[in-house]
Amino acid sequence: MSEVAAPVRVACVSVSAALGGSERVLLEFAARAARYGIEPTVVLPKDGPLAEALGTAGVAVAVAPASEGFLALSQRTRGAPDVWELVRGLRDWARAIRAQLPAGTRVLYSNGFKAHLACAGIPGYRRIWHLHEFPPERTGPIWPLLAAALSHRTIAVSEAVAHAWRVPRLLTPTVVLNGVDLELFRPAERTFWVHDALAVPRAARLIGMPAVFAKWKGQLLVVEAFERAASQLPDVHLVIVGGAIYDTAAERGYAEQLVRRVSRASQGGVAAPRPLNDRIHFLKFQPDPWRLYPEFDLVVHYSTRPEPFGRVVLEALACGIPVLAAQAGGPLEIVEAGRSGWLVPPNDPAALAGAMIRAAGADLAPLRGAARRRAESRFSADRHAEEVARLLRTVASGNG
């Protein structure tokens, strides 16, 4: 009788304790990992929503404290003080992570640029980087070369990300498309709780934009597009959902900027503009987003630069909600244009306005069914967890 292989003990290191897209991917993997021979401990730099959600899912969590100054550094910060803060922060966080690793840990599975570098400073473990982002353009080939030198394996969330990181003969990331929990994210009857919370007439149609409040997520472009389209969509309201959950220096003040922009939104000519702020609404970050999507008629996802994957796009499709998405990056691999949604040229508010008008006039019933079928065909959280676990076991065996 063959023996059941012992589970592989893995430390899943995340630079963020918030609950954005990549953190939800980690949460869904960790909650399923034991089914596929992985014993995970998620290591975070501080307590937060992710730690709470992991605890609810029964996943072990360890806090390896990192300084707030280090965590606030973003890809756009630069200069000698920032470099020193980064080096010191990485050194200290690597020590803290090492102190929290459970006995028997074999693999460091990192999520986020700072997590990748911190894990590289901990000798004696196999390392696998999960690439949720494109390498920063201004650094040229540095990050892909670092990945080739400092990791034993890399996972990319999309073909677009894999292509951006690939270095001939040195680095070929394995593509594992993200998934979602198809039991949570599923079509449901509308309850009108969003309409009621925002005091919007139940007869109104809603375009939803769930996204972290960050400049590159494109909320300002979506507001401009809605201004252009609003006169032809008199019964449509725009709902911007989210919050400033990542406290990096580059994004401070953006939420206030967005609120000011919406307060100035108007439709009509320059001579006689009519305020639109009664048709553009804010809804705070929703920790249970599967309750949110069924309340929308359409979801818009319009980042200003290519999205590495686009989890919001997938969540909406899984709930049977058609999507308007920028025609770049990961959404190209998720949305079947004309079947489960529409792909729109990026950074073009006029094109997005036209797409809003066309979508609002379309029969959405066939797209709703196609959206759900698309999610079911390739994007389950179980499939994702199984593929990631297989790679972790391979790396742990020394074959990665």
Task: Place the predicted regions along the sequence by residue.
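Short His-centered aromatic/hydrophobic patch
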Residues: 93, 109-116, 131
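Nucleotide-activated donor-binding/catalytic signature segment of Leloir-type glycosyltransferases, i.e.
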Residues: 252-284
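Conserved acidic donor-binding segment of nucleotide-sugar-dependent glycosyltransferases
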Residues: 327, 336-338, 342-349, 357-362
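Short hydrophobic beta-strand element within catalytic cores of glycosyltransferases
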Residues: 313, 322-325
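Acidic donor-binding loop of glycosyltransferase active sites
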Residues: 294-308, 321
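A short helix/loop element that forms part of the nucleotide-sugar donor recognition site in Leloir-type
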Residues: 186-200, 368, 372
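Conserved donor-binding/catalytic core segment of Leloir-type glycosyltransferases
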Residues: 11, 201-217, 223-226, 239
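Carbohydrate-associated surface elements
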Residues: 160, 179
